[in-house]
């Protein structure tokens, strides 16, 4: 395949590294090196969506010619609510108290156990879990066992912009990201995001200014949600408008591909 396409450029948007505890990250790293890295090393160039990922592939896995081309988001589709819109959307979704959205597929690195334990600490807050995946059944059973009446599993949704505008914060206690589109969508929607201080998330969020970066421990996550202010979301929106629109992302990608073409 690579002999047939000697100038092949690969785009990498998977997690690359997952920060599992108890040495789990090193097992993941070994698997990635065995299964993914050989193909990356044979490509003409590799594009990835965060500066951290580009540095990591080069430094840890010895991949050459890696270029960071950060993601963009549609800031017209994902926007803060207009006056009165949030209240109307809360009525549509039956939200009568503060609500937190968790937009993440049900896979191990998304750390839904921390979500459920955080919800247990905040019984006065509704948690809306959007996404499907191999662990959906497990987390449904866990929520029932924990008696979490404030947790809803919404599955796959086509109304994400409206859901963002209906809630008050977003929680993503992730253990592995490259560059999270859900984080960018939430920020563009003017929401405070509470997430973990893994490298790719720290590229998007400045703790205490455009969101919160806290360890994935339920008491810390719950406290950050209690303290989340609208100002975080306003500054997050301004950051995305300045650096991560679709137009900006397209221009970055076009410029990188043009440079690679000219270099031969």
Report residues per predicted region.
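Active-site proximal beta-strand in glycosyltransferases
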Residues: 2-20, 47
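Nucleotide-sugar donor phosphate/pyrophosphate-binding loop at the beta->alpha transition
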Residues: 18-38
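Carbohydrate-associated surface elements
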Residues: 52, 72
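A conserved mid-protein helix/loop that constitutes part of the nucleotide-sugar donor-binding site
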Residues: 98-121, 134-137
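Aromatic "clamp/platform" in nucleotide-sugar-dependent glycosyltransferases that forms part
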Residues: 156, 175
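Short hydrophobic beta-strand element within catalytic cores of glycosyltransferases
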Residues: 192-195, 205
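Conserved acidic donor-binding segment of nucleotide-sugar-dependent glycosyltransferases
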Residues: 206-217, 224-229
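A short, well-ordered alpha-helix in the C-terminal region of glycosyltransferases
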Residues: 230-249
